[in-house]
């Protein structure tokens, strides 16, 4: 008895080839109303996590799907395909790297996402009448924010005399910086300055009320992290003291350095 895979009455064409051929017959892409929608979950992805491109399709007469990296339907950019009603449904392409999985409804799962995965993806829906449909979506990838820390030019300022500069470390892109004092958001004060990116906080004249604790928080589209609290040891120094922590010249130098790009809060 012959092999069940043999084709005695017609020429055999591998089903992977049929899928690719159908997807590349762009002249069959006649105008039609879109029936496919894609939800990206989540839209902003944390590096190392996973993302789902969830396909919603109202049409029942589908031959299969192809996913491409980028906006072009091109064989070199094909990630993976799926053919309905065939035992070997998944058809990885040149752009497949082992982390992508396609489901029977066309939904694409990408695991252990890297920054290189960010960008646009195109789904090519292949219908039985070869009137194809293309839908594009994109997502972004961010590293989860690290735990920040606070550095300072002076954790032991002299009351009503010393300038204190607090900086939230590290400096990262696509990050929002927030400050907390005594577990509350920073209050408006004429003695406080913030850099334009909120990363640096300046106390123009420290007082006993400025002891803290101080915390800084960094946020980005995929998370937030807060520093350990720090406190200031605000000291009182008599007028007769001969060795202030900061001379007038030093104070002026600090002010010139930190006020560049600063904004009053």
Curated annotation (Swiss-Prot):
Under the heading InterPro entries, the entry gives:
CEA_cell_adhesion, Ig-like_dom, Ig-like_dom_sf, Ig-like_fold, Ig_sub, Ig_V-set
Q: Where in the cell is it found?
A: Cell membrane; Apical cell membrane
GO cellular component term of the entry, any: apical plasma membrane
The secretion signal range is 1-35
**Propeptide residues, chain positions:** 243-265
A GO MF annotation of the entry reads: protein tyrosine kinase binding
Q: Which UniProt keywords apply?
A: Cell membrane, Disulfide bond, Glycoprotein, GPI-anchor, Immunoglobulin domain, Lipoprotein, Membrane, Repeat, Signal
> In what residue span(s) does the Ig-like V-type domain sit?
36-142
Ranges for domain Ig-like C2-type: 146-233
Q: What is the reported tissue distribution? A: Expressed in columnar epithelial cells of the colon (at protein level). Strongly down-regulated in colonic adenocarcinomas.
Q: Which cysteine pairs are covalently linked by disulfides here? A: 168-216
Q: Where is the lipid attached (GPI-anchor amidated serine)?
A: 242
UniProt similarity note:
Belongs to the immunoglobulin superfamily. CEA family.
* Subunit record text: Homodimer.
According to UniProt, the name of this protein is: Cell adhesion molecule CEACAM7
This chain's source organism reads Homo sapiens
């Amino acid at each position: 008895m012959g092999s069940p895979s043999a084709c005695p009455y017609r020429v055999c064409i591998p089903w992977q080839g049929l899928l690719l051929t159908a997807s590349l017959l762009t002249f069959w892409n006649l105008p039609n109303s879109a029936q496919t929608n894609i939800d990206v979950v989540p839209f902003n992805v944390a590096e190392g996590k996973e993302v789902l491109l969830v396909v919603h399709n109202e049409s029942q007469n589908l031959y299969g799907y192809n996913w491409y990296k980028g906006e072009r339907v091109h064989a070199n950019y094909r990630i993976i395909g799926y053919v309905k009603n065939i035992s070997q449904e998944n058809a990885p392409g040149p752009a497949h790297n082992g982390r992508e999985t396609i489901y029977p409804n066309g939904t694409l799962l990408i695991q252990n996402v890297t920054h290189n995965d960010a960008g646009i993806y195109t789904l090519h829906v292949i219908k039985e009448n070869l009137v194809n449909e293309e839908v594009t979506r994109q997502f972004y990838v961010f590293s989860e924010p690290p735990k920040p820390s606070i550095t300072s030019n002076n954790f032991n300022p002299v009351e009503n005399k010393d300038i204190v500069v607090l900086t939230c470390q590290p400096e990262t892109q696509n990050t929002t910086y927030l400050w907390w004092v005594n577990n509350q958001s920073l209050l408006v004060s004429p003695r406080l300055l913030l850099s334009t990116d909120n990363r640096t906080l300046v106390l123009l004249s420290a007082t006993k009320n400025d002891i803290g604790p101080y915390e800084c928080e960094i946020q980005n589209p995929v998370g937030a992290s807060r520093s350990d609290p720090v406190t200031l040891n605000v000291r009182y120094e008599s007028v007769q003291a001969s060795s202030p922590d900061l001379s007038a010249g030093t104070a002026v130098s600090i002010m010139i350095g930190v006020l560049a790009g600063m904004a009053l809060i």
